[in-house]
Amino acid sequence: MAPKGKDLTRKVYEIICHRWPIHPSGICRIIGLELTVSNISKIKYHFDILKQKEMIHTKQIDRALVAWPAEIDKIRVVHEMMKGI
């Protein structure tokens, strides 16, 4: 059985951290949810919560929404600064 509420938000964040970049349907597959519009929308809702808390970044690529941890952008900035040295 899939987690619900805050447990699902936490699980979605863990999956994003370990398998980024990822989209909602990929998370549905990992959790074991059937790929329906309803379940994909449910995962997207948790993407929105995590984005509002600034824990992840998202980008719309054509019709696909892709997410990755916010920490990755921090690493990218440090990498860019080190290239300049």
Question: What do the PLM-derived regions correspond to, one by one?
Answer:
Residues 1-18, 39, 78:
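Short alpha-helical segments that sit at the start of domains
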Residues 3-6, 60-82:
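Short, cationic-aromatic polyanion-contact patches
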Residues 14, 29, 45:
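DNA-binding alpha-helical recognition surfaces that contact promoter or target DNA
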Residues 18, 49-52:
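The C-terminal cap of the DNA-recognition helix in HTH/winged-HTH DNA-binding domains
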Residues 22-31:
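Short acidic, hydrophobic short linear motifs in intrinsically disordered regions
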Residues 36-49:
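Short amphipathic alpha-helical interaction segments
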Residues 51-61:
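A short, conserved structural fragment
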